[in-house]
Swiss-Prot record:
Residues annotated to bind DNA: 26-45
Source organism of the structure: Escherichia coli
Name of a matching Pfam family: TetR_N
Binding site for Mg(2+): H100
Biological process annotations from GO: negative regulation of DNA-templated transcription; response to antibiotic
Binding site for tetracycline: H64, N82
Function text: TetR is the repressor of the tetracycline resistance element; its N-terminal region forms a helix-turn-helix structure and binds DNA. Binding of tetracycline to TetR reduces the repressor affinity for the tetracycline resistance gene (tetA) promoter operator sites.
Keywords: Antibiotic resistance, DNA-binding, Magnesium, Metal-binding, Plasmid, Repressor, Transcription, Transcription regulation, Transposable element
Gene transcribed to yield this protein: tetR
Domain of life of the native organism: Bacteria
UniProt GO molecular function: DNA-binding transcription factor activity; metal ion binding; transcription cis-regulatory region binding
HTH tetR-type domain residues: 3-63
Name of the molecule in the record: Tetracycline repressor protein class A from transposon 1721
Induction comment from the UniProt entry of this chain: By the [Mg-tetracycline]+ complex.
Length: 216
């Protein structure tokens, strides 16, 4: 009998995830999919949380194509490109944001984070401002995808017409405009607000502490 490999388990788990979602992804179902007994999975993943950590890492490795700075990036283009790429990686699989939330980063993610921080610090950010910028954009991206994927799931579960409280004309117009724009536009606008805010903060820091490398 061929020995079960971790990558085989991860691939099967990702396929199963797309079919049943994170709540339906159990070690029992995964073992059945692989044609093995449950204890065989524990050689590689001691529990479901460890498996989810591995799935999150695989999602990023497979789909996060702008995780580290490129040669032509400045700090703005990197943060924007990184966020867009991260979002696409989470959207690539059902419940991708839920899988990622709360995961423990492995060695590849730590190396990526180090490269990101070094790039931002070389662009003039302090270490504290650099990590806060990265975490703010990460939290925003995960939250945005959580809402987007939850909305897709809930639409099918609720079915029919959901009774709503009366809406004022202003609130109705705002909701209609938001719905018409769609999640891509909402994400881009929120991301622009964050990056613009970081640029303004850099101006404040420059006025207080003097220019830093990378300031325009």
């Amino acid at each position: 009998m061929t020995k079960l490999q971790p990558n085989t388990v991860i691939r099967a788990a990702l396929d199963l995830l797309n079919e049943v979602g994170v709540d339906g992804l159990t070690t029992r179902k995964l073992a059945e999919r692989l044609g093995v007994q449950q204890p065989a999975l524990y050689w590689h993943f001691r529990n479901k949380r460890a498996l989810l950590d591995a799935l999150a890492e695989a999602m990023l490795a497979e789909n996060h194509t702008h995780s580290v700075p490129r040669a032509d990036d400045d700090w703005r283009s990197f943060l924007i490109g990184n966020a867009r790429s991260f979002r696409q990686a989470l959207l690539a699989y059902r419940d991708g944001a839920r899988i990622h939330a709360g995961t423990r980063p492995g060695a590849p993610q730590m190396e990526t984070a180090d490269a990101q921080l070094r790039f931002l610090c070389e662009a003039g950010f302090s270490a504290g401002d650099a990590v806060n910028a990265l975490m703010t954009i990460s939290y925003f991206t995960v939250g945005a995808v959580l809402e987007e994927q939850a909305g897709d799931s809930d639409a099918g579960e609720r079915g029919g017409t959901v009774e709503q409280a009366p809406l004022s004309p202003l609130l109705r117009a705002a909701i209609d405009a938001f719905d018409e724009a769609g999640p891509d536009a909402a994400f881009e606008q929120g991301l622009a607000v964050i990056v613009d805010g970081l640029a303004k903060r850099r101006l404040v820091v420059r006025n207080v502490e003097g220019p830093r490398k990378g300031d325009d």
